[in-house]
Amino acid sequence: MKKFIELLSEPILATLEQKEKEIWDVEGRLKNANQPFKFDIRPLKQVNNKAEKIGYFKSKSDKMVFETINQWIIFDTEELNEYVKSTDKRDFNIDELLNNLSWNLILDKVE
Protein backbone atom coordinates (compact mmCIF):
# COMPACT_ATOMS: atom_id res chain seq x y z
CA MET A 1 0.00 0.00 0.00
CA LYS A 2 3.03 2.27 0.06
CA LYS A 3 2.43 2.87 -3.64
CA PHE A 4 -0.99 4.32 -2.82
CA ILE A 5 0.58 6.81 -0.42
CA GLU A 6 2.68 8.07 -3.33
CA LEU A 7 -0.59 9.21 -4.96
CA LEU A 8 -1.20 11.66 -2.09
CA SER A 9 0.05 15.20 -1.63
CA GLU A 10 1.53 15.83 1.82
CA PRO A 11 0.49 12.48 3.35
CA ILE A 12 0.25 12.22 7.13
CA LEU A 13 0.51 8.72 8.57
CA ALA A 14 -1.85 7.79 11.38
CA THR A 15 -0.40 7.12 14.81
CA LEU A 16 -0.69 3.60 16.21
CA GLU A 17 -3.52 4.82 18.45
CA GLN A 18 -5.38 6.34 15.47
CA LYS A 19 -4.94 3.12 13.48
CA GLU A 20 -6.35 1.03 16.32
CA LYS A 21 -9.12 3.31 17.64
CA GLU A 22 -10.11 5.35 14.59
CA ILE A 23 -9.25 2.73 11.94
CA TRP A 24 -7.54 4.86 9.31
CA ASP A 25 -3.98 4.73 8.01
CA VAL A 26 -3.06 7.88 6.12
CA GLU A 27 -4.48 11.35 5.60
CA GLY A 28 -3.82 13.30 2.46
CA ARG A 29 -5.12 14.83 -0.71
CA LEU A 30 -5.13 12.89 -3.94
CA LYS A 31 -2.94 14.73 -6.42
CA ASN A 32 -5.03 17.06 -8.61
CA ALA A 33 -7.81 17.04 -5.97
CA ASN A 34 -8.66 19.79 -3.54
CA GLN A 35 -9.93 17.98 -0.45
CA PRO A 36 -7.91 15.94 2.04
CA PHE A 37 -9.31 12.61 3.24
CA LYS A 38 -8.45 9.96 5.82
CA PHE A 39 -7.92 6.66 4.02
CA ASP A 40 -8.23 3.09 5.30
CA ILE A 41 -5.56 1.36 3.23
CA ARG A 42 -5.33 -1.93 5.12
CA PRO A 43 -4.55 -4.70 2.61
CA LEU A 44 -6.85 -7.57 1.72
CA LYS A 45 -6.21 -10.78 3.67
CA GLN A 46 -6.59 -14.37 2.53
CA VAL A 47 -9.28 -16.15 4.59
CA ASN A 48 -10.75 -19.49 3.54
CA ASN A 49 -9.42 -19.10 -0.01
CA LYS A 50 -11.00 -15.65 -0.36
CA ALA A 51 -9.39 -12.23 -0.30
CA GLU A 52 -11.27 -10.08 2.17
CA LYS A 53 -11.13 -6.82 4.02
CA ILE A 54 -13.11 -6.30 7.19
CA GLY A 55 -14.74 -2.91 7.62
CA TYR A 56 -15.74 -1.29 10.90
CA PHE A 57 -18.72 0.98 11.51
CA LYS A 58 -16.68 2.95 14.07
CA SER A 59 -14.03 3.84 11.48
CA LYS A 60 -13.16 7.53 11.23
CA SER A 61 -11.81 7.03 7.71
CA ASP A 62 -13.41 9.02 4.91
CA LYS A 63 -12.48 6.54 2.18
CA MET A 64 -11.70 2.82 2.04
CA VAL A 65 -9.11 1.69 -0.50
CA PHE A 66 -8.98 -1.73 -2.16
CA GLU A 67 -5.95 -2.79 -4.16
CA THR A 68 -6.32 -5.01 -7.21
CA ILE A 69 -3.60 -6.14 -9.59
CA ASN A 70 -3.95 -3.11 -11.87
CA GLN A 71 -6.04 -0.60 -9.92
CA TRP A 72 -6.82 1.19 -6.71
CA ILE A 73 -10.56 1.20 -6.00
CA ILE A 74 -11.74 3.79 -3.50
CA PHE A 75 -15.16 3.85 -1.81
CA ASP A 76 -16.74 6.41 0.50
CA THR A 77 -16.70 4.82 3.98
CA GLU A 78 -20.01 6.33 5.13
CA GLU A 79 -21.85 5.26 1.98
CA LEU A 80 -20.28 1.79 2.18
CA ASN A 81 -21.38 1.42 5.82
CA GLU A 82 -24.94 2.52 4.98
CA TYR A 83 -25.10 0.01 2.14
CA VAL A 84 -23.85 -2.81 4.37
CA LYS A 85 -26.41 -1.91 7.06
CA SER A 86 -29.22 -1.93 4.47
CA THR A 87 -28.65 -5.58 3.53
CA ASP A 88 -28.78 -8.90 5.34
CA LYS A 89 -25.43 -9.90 3.85
CA ARG A 90 -22.00 -9.90 5.42
CA ASP A 91 -19.88 -10.57 2.32
CA PHE A 92 -19.68 -8.29 -0.70
CA ASN A 93 -17.60 -8.38 -3.85
CA ILE A 94 -16.01 -5.36 -5.49
CA ASP A 95 -18.26 -5.48 -8.57
CA GLU A 96 -21.38 -5.41 -6.41
CA LEU A 97 -20.08 -2.39 -4.53
CA LEU A 98 -19.15 -0.58 -7.74
CA ASN A 99 -22.66 -1.20 -9.09
CA ASN A 100 -24.50 -0.13 -5.94
CA LEU A 101 -22.50 2.74 -4.50
CA SER A 102 -22.59 6.15 -6.13
CA TRP A 103 -19.24 7.44 -4.81
CA ASN A 104 -16.32 5.41 -6.06
CA LEU A 105 -13.07 6.18 -7.75
CA ILE A 106 -10.89 3.83 -9.78
CA LEU A 107 -7.26 4.76 -10.28
CA ASP A 108 -5.14 2.73 -12.66
CA LYS A 109 -1.74 1.78 -11.35
CA VAL A 110 1.12 3.26 -13.29
CA GLU A 111 4.36 1.28 -13.22
Predicted regions: what is each one?
Residues 22, 29, 38-40:
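Polybasic/polar functional segments that serve as interface/processing modules
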Residues 25-27, 65:
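Residue-level detector of beta-strand face positions
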Residues 27-29, 42, 110:
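Intrinsically disordered, low-complexity regions of eukaryotic proteins
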Residues 1-20, 30-33:
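Acidic-basic catalytic patches of nuclease active cores, encompassing PD-(D/E)XK
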Residues 89-111:
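Charged phosphate-binding loop/patch that engages nucleotide di/tri-phosphates or the phosphate backbone
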Residues 33-79:
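Catalytic cores of nucleic-acid endonucleases
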Residues 17-22, 56-58:
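A short catalytic or substrate-binding loop motif that flags glycine-/basic-rich loops and adjacent residues
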